[in-house]
């Protein structure tokens, strides 16, 4: 019987995931729904013309095509509960349930989650009332950041350099019904970093750290223009800093990860659900090398995935073993598994 993988999504991220899985000698075909022009040209990768919001059709496809694992690329289906639906139908799927996807799906939930579990983040306030929000920004030190509560494909974050810009941001995100709530938070200055993990936080718990990356969200040169979902990315973004500094940063990021895992495990008790999937922690490192969390995502970054899959390929690490098999049992000397985080790539 064929061993086929089903990847949901249509971007460069999904192309990179499918490309890496297609390199595995344990996989016959990788189906991508809906895929793109690039995936249509790859060997052993087949595009599937199904609307990714049509859960019933996706489930039927997985049942009828020897799909041993489905991998969800974008955040929308995760927040919409695609993982819950697949599990209810006895299908294997890699991604957190909607109970956890709210970490990405709601900025309000995410910031309150960080505050409750003492995870370092910028100071913030949330608002549903236009007038209250505009009164609050009158005495703020600029720049500030105004964020839509819900998903916005990377475009629901507006950096405001003065009160007029902040008022326009509030009007755009709140008054236009783009979001029922907004978050207004202090602007952080420093180096951004994406720390991404492959996680299973229940039972045989583990997390596998992937190389650090940095994406560039601004549309225009010199970090200017409106935010996008990501214009490009580099891995090993801190360059060849002094080893003592890198060691310190590793320790600090590890502390944040440990707090995050503890918080998720605490949440496990309420949801009785397993967090299985990717965990993306967006970080900011300031000039004093203090680290704060900007955001959580419950999937791989786009475009960072292109860097990550190339790194895994260069190091002969099979993505199949990391996410389709139970890596603890399928990878010999799992505890010695070490992905070289200093290999550089860019896209």
Task: Locate the predicted segments by residue.
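A conserved helix-loop-beta module that forms one wall/lid of the active-site cleft
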Residues: 94-156
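Internal nucleotide-binding/catalytic subdomain
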Residues: 156-303
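A glycine-rich beta-turn/hairpin centered on an aromatic-Pro dipeptide
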Residues: 325-347
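Short acidic-hydrophobic, aromatic-tinged amphipathic segments that line or gate anion-handling sites
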Residues: 47-53, 125-129, 160
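Active-site loop ensemble at the mouth of alpha/beta enzyme cores that anchors a bound cofactor
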Residues: 290-322
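Short, charged, surface-exposed secondary-structure boundary motifs
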Residues: 41-43, 102-108, 220-221
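General beta-strand structural signal in soluble alpha/beta enzymes
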Residues: 7, 32-33, 71-72, 93-96, ...
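ATP-binding N-terminal substructure of ATP-dependent carboxylate-amine bond-forming enzymes
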Residues: 1-98
């Amino acid at each position: 019987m064929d061993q086929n993988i089903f990847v949901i999504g249509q971007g460069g991220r999904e192309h990179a995931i499918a490309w890496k899985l297609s390199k595995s000698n344990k996989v016959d075909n990788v189906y991508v729904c809906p895929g793109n022009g690039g995936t249509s040209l790859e060997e052993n990768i087949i595009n599937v013309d199904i609307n990714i919001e049509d859960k019933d059709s996706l489930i039927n496809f997985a049942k009828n095509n020897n799909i041993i694992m489905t991998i969800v690329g974008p955040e929308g289906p995760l927040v919409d509960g695609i993982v819950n639906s697949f599990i209810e139908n006895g299908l294997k799927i890699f991604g957190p349930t909607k109970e956890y996807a709210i970490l990405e799906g709601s900025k309000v939930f995410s910031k309150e989650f960080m505050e409750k579990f003492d995870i370092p983040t910028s100071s913030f306030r949330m608002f549903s009332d236009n007038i209250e929000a505009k009164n609050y920004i009158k005495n703020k030190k600029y720049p500030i950041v105004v964020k839509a509560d819900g998903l916005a494909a990377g475009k629901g974050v507006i950096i405001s350099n003065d009160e007029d810009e902040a008022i326009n941001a509030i009007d755009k995100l709140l008054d236009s019904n783009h979001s029922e709530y907004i978050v207004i938070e202090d602007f952080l200055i420093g180096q951004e970093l994406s720390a991404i993990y492959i996680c299973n936080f229940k039972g045989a718990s583990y997390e596998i750290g992937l190389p650090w990356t940095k994406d560039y969200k601004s549309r225009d040169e010199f970090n200017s223009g409106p935010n996008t979902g990501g214009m490009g990315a580099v891995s090993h973004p801190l360059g060849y800093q002094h080893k003592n500094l890198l060691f310190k940063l590793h320790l600090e990021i590890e502390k944040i990860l440990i707090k995050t895992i503890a918080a998720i495990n605490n949440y496990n008790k309420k949801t009785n659900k397993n967090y299985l999937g990717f965990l993306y922690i967006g970080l900011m490192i300031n000039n004093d090398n203090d680290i704060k969390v900007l955001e959580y995502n419950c999937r791989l970054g786009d475009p960072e995935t292109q860097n990550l899959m190339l790194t895994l390929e260069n190091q002969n690490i099979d993505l199949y073993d990391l996410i389709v098999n139970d890596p603890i049992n399928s990878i010999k000397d799992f505890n010695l598994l070490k992905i070289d985080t200093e290999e550089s790539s860019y896209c």
